[in-house]
Amino acid sequence: MKSFVFALALIVAFACISESKSDHTGYEEEENLEDSELTDLVAAALLEELAEASEMDDLSYTEEAGGERMDKLEEMALKLKDKLKTMAEKGAQMGEKLKEMLPKAMEKLKELMEKMKNKMG
């Protein structure tokens, strides 16, 4: 049980890290901040739910209580799966945008190199 909660917490942490790394793509800073803040809020909410689920003070060790905890953990896992799917879709969209931007960037780089070459030689 505790290892399952710990594993979910690690997944949330990795999801937050991967989301923060994707923020450095050159898109509008305001959009990135909103996505980052949303991801942080979702991660905080999931971690809070995990912490609540792991507290055993007011729950007995009956089969029913264990089943309720497992149901809650399954629900949180599904939420996390949906969030990761959304993040993957956003990543794919950003990848497509980068593919579109790359030829333009390469062309500008060639132009700059040509200008420098003409100035030097």
UniProtKB/Swiss-Prot annotation:
GO cellular component, one term: extracellular region
Residues of the propeptide: 23-69
Main localization of the protein described in the UniProt heading: secreted
UniProt signal peptide: 1-22
Pfam families: Latarcin
Residue spans crossing the bilayer: none
Record-listed Methionine amide modification sites: 120
Subcellular location as annotated: Secreted
Keyword match Signal: yes
Tissue specificity note: Expressed by the venom gland.
Keywords annotated in UniProt: Amidation, Secreted, Signal
Role summary: Shows no antimicrobial activity against Gram-positive bacterium B.subtilis B-501 or Gram-negative bacterium E.coli DH5-alpha at concentrations up to 20 ug/ml. Shows no toxicity towards insect (S.carnaria) larvae.
Protein family (similarity comment): Belongs to the met-lysine family.
Protein name: Met-lysine-1b
